Structures are given as structure tokens and as C-alpha cells.
């Protein structure tokens, strides 16, 4: 009878656990153990442990069972069989020993007052269960987020054994004989089920993120050639067709700030390319630059009353934080936008904005009066881009977190590259961020192959030409070390030199032949891995910006190569100054 009643209580806890784990906010909480997350977890599991106490089964002094809906108080001579230890154990495994001990204290204190100020030992035993369960759980986790099923069962048995030991000492072993087996089974099964539900949700989320990242990368790969042409009706139509072909949306559209550029799918009869943007939803997104989701026709607000589009997500496309258009995805019929579609579209919009910025920068460079400077500043090595994309694609299958990290580093590299395409000079902080993003991607491709270090005695707001470090670091990565797999060191140094700063990049590579070194920076060379064009352009930019005193210098022997130049000792006063001449 006791076992049946306890399983009923377990069912209550499992229903609450399912509702809790189904909440995305709770799943986000358990990924970090900061003070804020700890407090929220304590509140949640504190409520659970109180519910466990008041839904328990009262055991009278004659060992008869009393079932009441809610046990607010019991006689000091009576005992209680409940799921308190189960909740404390689960709290410890999810939040660690700190959360487990506090939840145990809450449960023990509540049990003390529930028992008419008797059973103070429950406070000590419950706190001890929380600490021991949390410590053992942390020890067993190793590289996994949570212990395995067998380990959870072991922890549950240990936790319940601690509780039974206190009950036996302070209440009597006859009671322990009556409840120990049901409580052991209950605690082990409940903890296992709770963790299984949680791990299933987390695993599904991780797989979903990996699939989303893969989809975004595939669409990025296919749309790149079109978006770099800019937002034109032709490029927009090609992009919309690709998105429509690879997703389950019923309609896809692209606009500039005023007109529809392309609309593929349902609604193409009245959302016509070349005509003004019709829906209030799209107009508001373009106006304030904030993404919006509509789950019904009224929210879309299309003036055509026969429009079949029923839900939509509209995301702004931005270049340098200015909205230049909108990406629109629609469902028809009864389908609504889920979090999956929302994340996909937001990710696509960020990538598309970067691609548009790349294309516009290239076009502006062709028309700029300082084309020689602009051309180099806007260059993004296509081989580096596609190698990085392939690396990320490979990481998706084995480590989605590393794939997201690589994608963020690639995004940082593109952003700083595009900023360099707009500015004549950047701060040392910006250039160093560019170098770090480049090296982080390279290190993901070739773990442990390169070691980059800095020795800088200059303010972060010191100004230097865009790519003034990145070109030299990339040159070392591509040419200095040949096939050597390890012990490849690159050192970036910036030191005061009178009214100048001396900027140098050195490596411990295999050196440069005498026939080539005299040509570097002056003219292109015939080499299998490059022509030295980037060095020539950098040298020309240094001359144009600062004069011949700042030209590139090279020294090399069998122990490595050093490249250096000098720039005036001036600190940038306006961080947002753009070179628009």
C-alpha cells in the first residue's frame, strides 16, 4: 500500500518536473551557476521540496497509513513518507552542492514546523543529503553535463541511506524497516526520470542548434555570390528562390527601404517586385530596425483582404547599424512561427547583412578616389572564408559549441574587415581584435600549430592603418612554417621609438631566401602560395599615410623572419572618424 501511495506522489512531482523542464527559461538557468541563477534554482526547488512535504503520507505511531490531500501539520509522534529526498537529490545534481544544501535546509525546516516543532534532525540530514549528493554528482560529471543513469541511481541510494540512518537513530529502526525499500526505489526512480527528461530536452536543443547552424551555413554558401552584388531585384529574387527551396516557408520576400525587391511563393500576385512595401508589419520593421513576429493576418496588416499569408517574421537587414531593407518569411494557413523558425531567420539576417556590407564596400572601393588604399582594406581572402566555412561545417557534426564559437570569430573577422574598408586608420584595439579573430579561426583549423603572443608598450587608442598587423600575421601563418606542425611562434611587438612607434611581427620560421626578400613590399613575386600583393599594398598605404619613413623593412635568416615599420606617435581623438575622401 505504501509503495502505491508513494508512486502517486512521484507522479505529481514528475508532472511538475515535466512542466518545469519544458520551460526554456529553466533550461537556460541550469547552464550557468552564477549568483542570479543559483537564487532562482533555490526558489524553484524550494517550492518543490515544500510540495513534497505537504503531499507526503502520514504514518501513525501504530504504523497505520493516513492519506490526506495536504499535510500542513502532523502530530509530533507521527512520521512522514514523502519525496523530499528525491527533490533535494535532483536539486543537487542540477544546481550543485550549494543549491542542494540550501534546498535541503528549506525542506528540513519546513518538515520541522510541519511536525509540530519536532524532528529537528531532518534539518541536518536534509542539508547533508544536499551537500553529499552535489559533491558526488560534480565528481562523477567529468566531461558530461550530468551523471549517467547508473551513477544517478548510486547517488540516490546514498542520499536515501543518509536519511534512513538519521530516521533510525532518532525515530526507531522499526519505521526504517517499513519505509526503506519503497523510499529507495522511489528516490532512485524519480531522480533518474527527472534527469532523463532534462537530458533529453538538452540533447534535442543541442541537435536543433547544430541543424540550424548547418542550414544557415548552407544558405550562406549559396547566397553569397548574389548578396555581394547588393540589394537588386535580380539578386533578391535569386536569394529568395534559394531560401524557399531549402526551407518550409510558404513565401519569402526581400525589400529595400521602400519597395518590394522580390517575393517568391504564396502572395506573389499582390506582393509584386518594384511596388511599394504593402504591409504595416514590414514598414514598422524598416522604420525602427527591430525584428517582429506576427502570428495572425491582423498583425501582418496586408491591405489585400484576400491575402492567404497568416503568420510572418520580418527582420531588418543592416549595414553599419543602418537599416537598408528587410528579410520576410511567411506561413499560410494555420501554421505559426515557432522559436525554430525565429532563430533561423534571425541568423540568416545577420549573415546576409554582413554579405551585403561586403558587397557594398567592394562597390564603394571601385568608386573611391583613394582606390589603392580602399582596395586592400576591403579585401577578404576567399580561401580563408571557404576554409573557415568548411571547418565550421565539420565542427557542427562533432562539437556544436565550438562551431558557434568559430562562427562568432568569423563574424568578428568580417566586421573588423568591413570597418577597415571604411576607415583610413583604426585603433590598436580594433586591429588586435581583427588579428585575434583571424588566429582563433586558424587555431580551430590547426589546433596547437600556432602560438601568437604580444609585447606591446602603446595605448589601445594608438592609430595605425587597417590590416597593419593582420597582413603581417597572416603572411607569417601562410609562408613562415612550411609543413611544420608544432612550435610555430609569432610575436607582435609595438615599442616607442622617439616620435614614432616601431611595429614589428616576427616568427621562428624557416626564413626567406635572399632572392625574394629584397622584392617584398616593392613588387609582386612568383611564389606557389602567394604573390606578395598584400605586402605591396600595405607598403604603399604606409607611404601614402605617413611618408617614406614608415615603409616596410624585412630581416630574415634560418631562425626566422622579422617585418617592421614605424608610424607617428599620435593617438586617435575620434574613434568614429571615417575616411570618406
Swiss-Prot record:
InterPro entries: Bact_2-comp_sensor_kinase, GAF-like_dom_sf, HATPase_C_sf, Sig_transdc_His_kin_internal, Sig_transdc_His_kinase_LytS_TM. GO terms for molecular function: ATP binding; phosphorelay sensor kinase activity. The modification Phosphohistidine is found at residue 383. The chain crosses the membrane at residues 4-26, 38-57, 86-108, 115-137, 152-174, 179-198. Residues 231-355 form the GAF domain. The keyword Transit peptide does not apply. It catalyses: ATP + protein L-histidine = ADP + protein N-phospho-L-histidine. GO terms for biological process: cell wall organization. Keywords: ATP-binding, Cell membrane, Kinase, Membrane, Nucleotide-binding, Phosphoprotein, Transferase, Transmembrane, Transmembrane helix, Two-component regulatory system. The keyword Transcription regulation does not apply. It comes from the Bacteria. It is found in: Cell membrane. It holds the Pfam family HATPase_c. It is a multi-pass membrane protein. Member of the two-component regulatory system LytR/LytS that probably regulates genes involved in cell wall metabolism. This is Sensor protein LytS. It comes from Streptococcus agalactiae serotype V (strain ATCC BAA-611 / 2603 V/R).
